[in-house]
UniProtKB/Swiss-Prot annotation:
Species lineage: Eukaryota, Metazoa, Ecdysozoa, Arthropoda, Crustacea
Family recorded in the similarity comment: Belongs to the metallothionein superfamily. Type 3 family.
Key word Metal-binding present: yes
UniProt name for this protein: Metallothionein-1B
Region (Alpha): 30-59
Length: 59
């Protein structure tokens, strides 16, 4: 079963993806916390430091 906000894509809201979103193809705008203050060296570190890992995370 897809996540709660999955139809063709995730539902976005201000700050990133809608809460509870389990969609792996989600492409929401980066949240303010990440765009303003995320200085992480790795994707794993970013996911722990930021409330929602965003586009600031290393690929």
């Amino acid at each position: 079963m897809p996540g709660p906000c999955c139809n063709d894509k995730c539902v976005c809201q201000e700050g990133g993806c809608k809460a509870g979103c389990q969609c792996t193809s989600c492409r929401c705008s980066p949240c303010q916390k990440c765009t303003s203050g995320c200085k992480c060296a790795t994707k794993e570190e970013c996911s722990k430091t930021c409330t929602k890992p965003c586009s600031c995370c290393p690929k």
